[in-house]
């Protein structure tokens, strides 16, 4: 088996560059591409990526890429790969698939042929015609794009947004990975006050606190790669120990959130406790329209209701206007919000100083920041 393999850290549309920079900071050079960031690394590096990436959805091992213009070419290409290095005679290996602009447009047929080719390979290697599939799962994916087939193994298992601290999503759930990306893209930096005036169940502020405390987002969960065959388990254990040692919750200061819903605030506190950050973020019941904070500099960051239903739109627009007033009451502060509402800036009362477009789930959104310092004229 080789020391280095090709990997992909998948990401929501618009966040590929954010994930590539995360990998670079881990000492793993990466290149952003549509749908994620591609990199070459060891199994140990992939374990660190699973443990530390805040904004990626999954880490995938690329088994190979090859031309497949016919089902026969797909079968032979899959069969030629060393599946026995990762799959035992008892491993379950479900196959998912995706096709785009390929001559082989039947996803179901591509999945079936891929499964059959892997079985034929394993039959010859394990010298058996019967596979129990009674042990751990190794998830296989076949993707065909423009007649190029790519075969991957899922090294994450459960998606990376599942940190383990959130047990209730609320009415407007924001994935932990997206929340971490918004924190990263906002003007806030550790040491500055940060406040979410509509915190809901606390995800944005908890992700900010985890970053400030250098808490690995995957610290309390497991990953599929840890169950793979022939893995460096001692190295994986050391990587976890290093992450535990790096966690410094005493560094957290100046992060707070508020919501008008007492139940949401109670859940935010519970999630904070489950993240191992009990008492490190101040969550309180309060109306965002009455918010008044101290400090000459700081950052507001929030996920407002989008008003997707026509009946909610006017109420949301009035709320956006109140947020514009909130920023005016806090000169020297910035305010960042993610929204799919086309009239957000008009209701807010000013144009955004910075915008970034991406998808929150299936909704096309813009991440807007107001109150950035004007560049000095030369």
Residue positions per predicted region:
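SAM-dependent Rossmann-like transferase core, predominantly class I methyltransferases
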Residues: 151-187
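C-terminal edge-of-domain segments
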Residues: 140-156, 368
